[in-house]
């Protein structure tokens, strides 16, 4: 899809054959993309990364938030000012600074914002509250 819209498949993306049946692909890196392209407008669950060139931090934050989805967002920076601002203003359920955007500790809530979220947060106390039915019972023996 990205290549049909003039994105460049820099590496990966080929289907892999494995002993176990399934749909496996090599991690793909796609460059020369724009915010309007499908690769950047749809939620892709696979080992795919696309690159959108921006001129500065403000444009990067605007591009990151210009999506109907918001599972996770991340920034790589040496600027404490940008790191702090990004954590507060990125419209995502999980925000990482100088870390991968996948994976969180089991004790913290997991979930997205906007169209990336469905139902309550998984993991952490939010999950405990959702999956637990509280009952108070008394017995006089």
For every predicted segment, state its role:
Residues 5, 20:
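Short, ordered coil/turn segments that flank beta-strands lining enzyme active or ligand-binding pockets
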Residues 17, 24-141:
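Conserved C-terminal structural/oligomerization subdomain of aldehyde/semialdehyde dehydrogenase
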Residues 6-15:
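Short secondary-structure junctions
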